[in-house]
């Protein structure tokens, strides 16, 4: 029986693809295990949502693009992580490693290479992240979500596969969503998502502009951990720090979304054909990958994009109004998008690429 080791972590985006793939792997008759960090979000997500999967924690450092004394310490953490990962891989003897990226994946990919275990990397963003750039040297193949990403990668190693969407995404129940929120079925619903870490600026603008928004929408506000404001209570407005199991039901009643521009999330909105106003993480908080993602979706006619630095109450309202006027066109553009691979076909390709 073919055994696949999965790795990736640090953010929800680096875990969600694996969360969508592992159940398919199991249903196809493959064995699966997960290698991640000791305290990262991947451990919480995998152990809570896939308790049947063996989770192996390893030491991991952080990849920084700037000079810091912490970099010296992290070199030793990465070396320790390679040794930890080698022990796991020698014990489990997987046939291949699937790496979703994030700093924890680098020592695992290096360890796999040292044991002649083939690695397949997945890159969700339009431009490759630092971890995947490093890991690519030790990997057999890299799969991309955006076709344009192939321009940044060696042709002999890179293949475009499209987005990997979780199975339950389209199973949301609108009736349950309305019951959960207490919303009126005859009024539009706006979902605001600031990403797993939340956005203080976006949260502030939504709250300051709530009365104006509530004239047109009912608002579901996912604030991010620790950013919920219990003092803000209005009819037609509901806050959550983070939603797991009920998210598909909330998406089932959503007409429009304001969101960060992580690729996994925006491809989910695209699959559900929900018009989106994207506010990507700025260069002061990221390498600019979300800016690229947002601009690409805007160019395709799937979304509108606003730089967070330019975000004001007036601009937010203006962009929402324009998007509502263009709603039919945006949804028609979304209908042209087709998923490249089913998950079953993806695993067939993965096994063929890794083991041949």
Curated annotation (Swiss-Prot):
**Its GO biological process terms?**
carbohydrate metabolic process; cell division; cell wall organization; lipid glycosylation; peptidoglycan biosynthetic process; regulation of cell shape
Keyword annotations from UniProtKB, A to Z: Cell cycle, Cell division, Cell membrane, Cell shape, Cell wall biogenesis/degradation, Glycosyltransferase, Membrane, Peptidoglycan synthesis, Transferase
Chief localisation class:
membrane
Q: Which family does it belong to?
A: Belongs to the glycosyltransferase 28 family. MurG subfamily.
Q: In which pathway does it act?
A: Cell wall biogenesis; peptidoglycan biosynthesis
State its role. Answer: Cell wall formation. Catalyzes the transfer of a GlcNAc subunit on undecaprenyl-pyrophosphoryl-MurNAc-pentapeptide (lipid intermediate I) to form undecaprenyl-pyrophosphoryl-MurNAc-(pentapeptide)GlcNAc (lipid intermediate II).
Q: Where in the cell is it found?
A: Cell membrane
The source's domain of life comes to: Bacteria
Q: What is this protein called?
A: UDP-N-acetylglucosamine--N-acetylmuramyl-(pentapeptide) pyrophosphoryl-undecaprenol N-acetylglucosamine transferase
Please tell me which top-level EC class this enzyme sits in: transferase
Its placement in the membrane is given as: Peripheral membrane protein
Which residues are noted in the entry as UDP-N-acetyl-alpha-D-glucosamine-binding?
166, 196, 290
Which Pfam families does this entry report, sorted A to Z?
A: Glyco_tran_28_C, Glyco_transf_28
Write one Gene Ontology MF term: undecaprenyldiphospho-muramoylpentapeptide beta-N-acetylglucosaminyltransferase activity
Q: Does the keyword Cell division apply?
A: yes
HAMAP family in UniProt:
MurG
- Catalytic reactions on record: Mur2Ac(oyl-L-Ala-gamma-D-Glu-L-Lys-D-Ala-D-Ala)-di-trans,octa-cis-undecaprenyl diphosphate + UDP-N-acetyl-alpha-D-glucosamine = beta-D-GlcNAc-(1->4)-Mur2Ac(oyl-L-Ala-gamma-D-Glu-L-Lys-D-Ala-D-Ala)-di-trans,octa-cis-undecaprenyl diphosphate + UDP + H(+)
Does rRNA-binding appear among the keywords? no
Q: What is its EC number?
A: 2.4.1.227
Which Gene Ontology CC terms are recorded? plasma membrane
* InterPro entries xrefs: GlcNAc_MurG, Glyco_trans_28_C, GlycoTrans_28_N
């Amino acid at each position: 029986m073919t055994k696949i080791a999965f790795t990736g972590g640090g953010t929800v985006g680096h875990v969600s693809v694996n969360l969508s793939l592992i159940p398919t792997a199991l249903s196809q008759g493959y064995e699966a295990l997960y290698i991640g960090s000791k305290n990262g979000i991947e451990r919480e997500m995998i152990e809570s949502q896939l308790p049947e999967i063996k989770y192996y924690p390893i030491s991991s450092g952080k990849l920084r693009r700037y000079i810091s004394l912490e970099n010296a310490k992290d070199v030793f953490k990465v070396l320790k992580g390679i040794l930890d990962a080698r022990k796991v891989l020698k014990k489990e003897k997987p046939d291949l490693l699937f790496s979703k990226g994030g700093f924890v994946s680098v020592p695992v990919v290096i360890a796999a290479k040292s044991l002649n275990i083939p690695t397949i990397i997945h890159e969700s963003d339009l431009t490759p992240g630092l971890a995947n750039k490093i890991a690519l040297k030790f990997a057999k193949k890299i799969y991309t979500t955006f076709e344009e990403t192939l321009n940044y990668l060696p042709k002999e190693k890179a293949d475009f596969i499209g987005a990997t969407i979780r199975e339950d995404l389209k199973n949301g129940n609108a009736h349950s969503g309305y019951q959960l929120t207490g919303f009126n079925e005859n009024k539009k619903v706006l979902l605001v998502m600031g990403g797993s870490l939340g956005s203080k600026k976006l949260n502030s603008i939504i709250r300051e502009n709530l009365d104006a928004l509530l004239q047109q929408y009912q608002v579901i506000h996912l604030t991010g951990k620790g950013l919920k404001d219990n003092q803000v209570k209005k009819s037609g407005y509901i806050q959550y720090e983070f939603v797991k199991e009920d998210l598909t039901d909330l998406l089932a009643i959503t007409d429009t979304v304001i969101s960060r521009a992580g690729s996994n999330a925006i491809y989910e909105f695209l699959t559900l054909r929900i018009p989106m106003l994207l506010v990507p993480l700025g260069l002061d908080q990221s390498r600019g990958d979300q800016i690229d993602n947002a601009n690409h979706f805007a160019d395709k006619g799937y979304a509108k994009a606003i730089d967070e630095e330019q975000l004001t109450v007036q601009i937010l309202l203006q962009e929402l109004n324009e998007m509502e006027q263009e709603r039919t066109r945006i949804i028609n553009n979304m209908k042209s998008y087709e998923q490249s691979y089913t998950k079953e076909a993806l695993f067939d390709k993965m096994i063929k690429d890794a083991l041949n």
